[in-house]
Amino acid sequence: MNHVLDETPTNLNYQLGNKQFRLLKIISIISLLFMLWHDLDHLRVVMHRSYSIVPQQFVTVFIAYVPAIAAFYMAYKRSAYAALTGLIAGILLLMGFFLLHIIGTSAISPIFDSFLGAWKVPFAALHSDLFSWLNLIANMVSSVVMIMLSFHFLAAQLTGRLKV
């Protein structure tokens, strides 16, 4: 009797398929577009309310784009870590929007005050209009979708239950 012990089932697949990579790219692009819409909304508010933009805010904007760009890049390159990168990116983006615009960084630490200018306080304290709120909600929802999609793909990838 000759039994092979290290035989793996044929349906065990740890690599993401075309469908999963395509969905990760799509949600990353949607997230980047919503973030661009969000930043353009900041410019609209600056023009209407005569706020000033401090140069340090551009650093914050740059840092905010890094997770979504990384998630898109990993999906574009068809990396085995694309789902993990998408999950981390979604969490970072959701936390960033929540901390910056719902809680307000002035409640967390005065360190952020010089970086964020007028946006150191929450949206409610800024008396943001409906357009800004809808924009913020769209960004947070896209982050939640990125988290859920990436988590689903990552769990299926790690357990070998990925249907490609």
How would you label these PLM feature ranges?
Residues 2-32, 145-162:
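Cytosolic juxtamembrane helix and N-cap/initiation of the first transmembrane helix
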Residues 19-29, 55-62, 81-88, 130-140:
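Alpha-helical transmembrane segments of integral membrane proteins
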Residues 33-42, 92-111:
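C-terminal TM-helix exit segments that contain a strictly Trp-centered aromatic cap at the helix terminus
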Residues 33-35, 55-75:
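Core segments of alpha-helical transmembrane spans in multipass integral membrane proteins
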Residues 37-55, 110-124:
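Membrane-interface interhelical loops and short amphipathic "cap" helices
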Residues 63-69, 139-146:
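Core segments of transmembrane alpha-helices
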Residues 73-104:
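Loop-to-transmembrane helix junctions at the membrane interface
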Residues 119-145:
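Individual transmembrane alpha-helices with interfacial aromatic-anchor signatures
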